[in-house]
Amino acid sequence: MKNSIRTAVIICFAFLGALPLRGQELSLEIPLWATPPTENNGLTGPETKVGSKGFTANVSYPVLKVYRADAARNTGTAVLIAPGGGYGALAMRQEGDPFAAWLAGQGITGVVLKYRMPNGHHRIPLEDAKQGMRLIREHAREWQIDTARIGVMGFSAGGHLAATLLTRYEATSRPAFGILFYPVISFDDRWAHRGSVQNLLGADSTETMKTYYSNELQVTPQTPPTLLLLSNNDGTVKPRNSIMFYEALRENRVLTALYIFPSGGHGCKSRLIRFID
């Protein structure tokens, strides 16, 4: 367990200090499901780019984008990466591909999970995340990955998905560790990111379902070691989300670390590292 959190810390702080990002090219892209999954998200039409940052919306066809580790530096570690976007779109270009490419250059296989948007079908993202972990395990020998060193990383709403996987995994989809950047954790009205709640739960936004998806309430002693990173002045996802998850991990004697940067707001690396300058 200590090795897992040590690996997570090294990954994150090496990444935060690496400017500009350089890494490996995309190795392959594979369908997440060999046959269409049972539950459909009800979205029709092609994927679209939305907003000034070009997030990917209307995602109904999930894939894994695999950036294999530099062979000369391969550590045997792999990370499944869940970009954020409020469960309504995916920040693939900000919180997916660049990070995976950089990890691969450091000897860590980066696997970007392009998961389906739930559109109120709340089970869909977690099922995609579990399947992503299973596929990495299935290809472990081919991709030269140690099955005991497969972790999950998530940003914002992708952090909520990663935290849900960390607390609701099955034997075939258990992460060795978690790395959560400014994650949505709680669906409690006092702390929740409302857009994420609405997009994930839709009309099923009952108090029972909000409790079910409040991941600070789902931690057990079997939750994998987890590292959390965020900015103190995040105005999009309240810092209390990460603090509650950290406290729950400590109460359950799960190895954990929490880093709160003094500034940076809500967003990826370029903002988080401002305090270093």
Describe each model-derived feature in a short phrase:
Residues P239, I243-D277:
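C-terminal catalytic histidine-bearing segment of alpha/beta-hydrolase fold enzymes
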Residues T75-G84:
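Short beta-strand element of the alpha/beta-hydrolase
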Residues Q131-S196, K210-T211, N215:
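Primarily recognizes the serine-hydrolase "nucleophile elbow" in alpha/beta-hydrolase
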Residues P83-G88, N232:
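Active-site glycine-rich loops that stabilize anionic/oxyanionic intermediates
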Residues M1-S27:
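Bacterial Sec-dependent N-terminal signal peptides
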Residues Q222, L227-L230, D234:
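Short beta-strand/loop motif that positions the catalytic acidic residue
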Residues P62, A203-Q218, T223-P224:
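Active-site nucleophile elbow and catalytic-triad environment of alpha/beta-hydrolase enzymes
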Residues L90-A100, V111-T147, S270-R274:
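Catalytic nucleophile-loop/oxyanion-hole region of alpha/beta-hydrolase
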